[in-house]
């Protein structure tokens, strides 16, 4: 059965199996401690024309990107594992998708680590069921096309960049939503993403908030959320920020049929 004749259910099953394979491979290699590197790689990719894998493939010799080489080496092993399990006729995972999924995996694991620490601080034994019950979904979109060459150079902000410089840098990514004058990555997602990309996210958020009223308001909002058991407002907005950064609006070229492959009827079971 060729790709063009697949039913909607079959396409969904194939894409779900592919996603689960990618997630399993990443969770065995990427941890919460990798979140700063994973998010910085995603930022570097988005900044050079959209998430298309160019940061990992062609741009590791640029300034701050050089420090990401060990993390990219880890992702190469993950990619090899994912691709080795591809079905006949199925494309290997793109570097654009792997960059997005790695950031998603590391950030999700940092959420879990925060909840575990909160349970333990209260003298409660954490368990996966309880953590899952208070966790928010982290949306996924796959099918990013990889670049054939390096994108336009755009360095990540310096460690001592001012709040205004951070906001301006993020405002330069992608195009605003239709009918909106607000940047694609406005103050709130900028605070989340830059905090997540920093070795000490709490300290960096505090530094930015101390010098900018808009960022201070965003930090206060998320601090209140992070004091709750579910951390819903913070985690939902963080997931949206990561997805927005890797979206078509940031410059990614996305083909949702990228990982479909020919199948026999027996290969895709509808349950």
Ranges and model annotations:
Residues 2-271:
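Long, well-ordered alpha/beta core segments of mature domains
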């Amino acid at each position: 059965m060729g790709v063009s004749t697949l039913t909607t259910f079959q396409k969904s099953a194939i894409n779900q199996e592919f996603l689960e394979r990618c997630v399993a491979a990443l969770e065995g290699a990427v941890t919460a401690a990798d979140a700063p590197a994973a998010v910085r790689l995603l930022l570097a990719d988005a900044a050079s024309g959209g998430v298309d894998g160019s940061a990992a493939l062609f741009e590791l010799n640029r300034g701050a990107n050089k420090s990401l080489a060990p993390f990219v080496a880890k992702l190469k092993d993950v990619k090899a594992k994912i691709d080795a399990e591809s079905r006949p006729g199925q494309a290997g995972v793109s570097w654009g998708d792997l960059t997005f999924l790695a950031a998603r995996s590391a950030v999700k694991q940092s959420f879990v680590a925060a909840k575990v620490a909160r349970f333990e601080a209260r003298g409660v034994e954490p368990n996966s069921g309880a953590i899952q019950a208070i966790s928010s979904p982290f949306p996924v979109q796959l099918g990013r096309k990889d670049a054939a060459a390096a994108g336009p150079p755009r360095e990540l902000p310096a460690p001592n960049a001012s709040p205004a410089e951070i906001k301006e840098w993020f405002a330069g990514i992608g195009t605003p939503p239709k009918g909106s004058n607000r940047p694609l990555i406005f103050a709130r997602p900028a605070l989340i993403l830059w905090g997540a990309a920093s070795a000490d996210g709490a300290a960096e958020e505090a530094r930015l908030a101390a010098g900018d009223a808009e960022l201070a308001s965003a930090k206060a909002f998320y601090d209140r959320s992070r004091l709750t058991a579910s951390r819903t407002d913070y985690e939902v907005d963080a997931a949206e920020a990561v997805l927005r950064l890797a979206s078509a609006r940031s410059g990614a070229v996305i083909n949702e049929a990228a990982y479909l492959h020919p199948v026999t009827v027996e290969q895709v079971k509808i349950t």
